[in-house]
Amino acid sequence: MDKNIKEIIKNMDLKFRNIDGKKLLLAISTDKQKNVLMTAFMSEESLEKSIETGYMHYYSTSRDKIWKKGEESKNVQKIIDVYRDCDGDALLFTVEQTGWACHEGYMSCFHNKIDLNTGDSTVIGTKLD
């Protein structure tokens, strides 16, 4: 790994949290209009790959591995900007989304609106696949 990328990450002053025995932080991706597309975890290695390639890489706790967003679907996320939260344990990425972000075929993973009076959910948005 390029030493420069490790320096960049060090300068970001991040606080990776112990989640399922792994050092992870929360990554949120939005489009240019600031619509939330998805959230996932990142490890330091997936963050390195994201910086190195310019495309989002996440850490899957269920598969216990790093994955490039769109490696199977081709619905990749090209990084435009990144913001660190005040605690340093979450990153907000502005991305250029190719295709849809959700593996269920919706633009956003947040397509289930919950009624707080009943707990019932309603699918909003259009399935794109």
From Swiss-Prot:
Subcellular location: Cytoplasm
Keyword flag Ubl conjugation: no
Substrates-to-products reaction catalysed: 1-(5-phospho-beta-D-ribosyl)-5'-AMP + H2O = 1-(5-phospho-beta-D-ribosyl)-5-[(5-phospho-beta-D-ribosylamino)methylideneamino]imidazole-4-carboxamide
Annotated InterPro entries: PRib_AMP_CycHydrolase_dom, PRib_AMP_CycHydrolase_sf
Cofactor binding, note field: Binds 1 Mg(2+) ion per subunit.
Recorded GO MF terms: metal ion binding; phosphoribosyl-AMP cyclohydrolase activity
Residues the record lists as binding Mg(2+): 85, 87, 89
Pfam families documented for this protein: PRA-CH (PF01502)
Residues bound to Zn(2+): 86, 102, 109
EC number: 3.5.4.19
Cofactor(s) the record lists: Mg(2+); Zn(2+)
Principal location listed in the UniProt entry: cytoplasm
Associated pathway: Amino-acid biosynthesis; L-histidine biosynthesis; L-histidine from 5-phospho-alpha-D-ribose 1-diphosphate: step 3/9
Gene Ontology CC: one annotated term: cytoplasm
Gene Ontology biological process terms in this record: L-histidine biosynthetic process
Source domain of life: Archaea
Catalytic EC class: hydrolase
UniProt keyword annotation of Nucleotide-binding present: no
UniProt subunit comment: Homodimer.
Entry similarity comment: Belongs to the PRA-CH family.
Protein function: Catalyzes the hydrolysis of the adenine ring of phosphoribosyl-AMP.
Protein name, as recorded: Phosphoribosyl-AMP cyclohydrolase
Source species: Methanococcus maripaludis (strain DSM 14266 / JCM 13030 / NBRC 101832 / S2 / LL)
Lineage: Archaea, Methanobacteriati, Methanobacteriota, Methanomada group, Methanococci
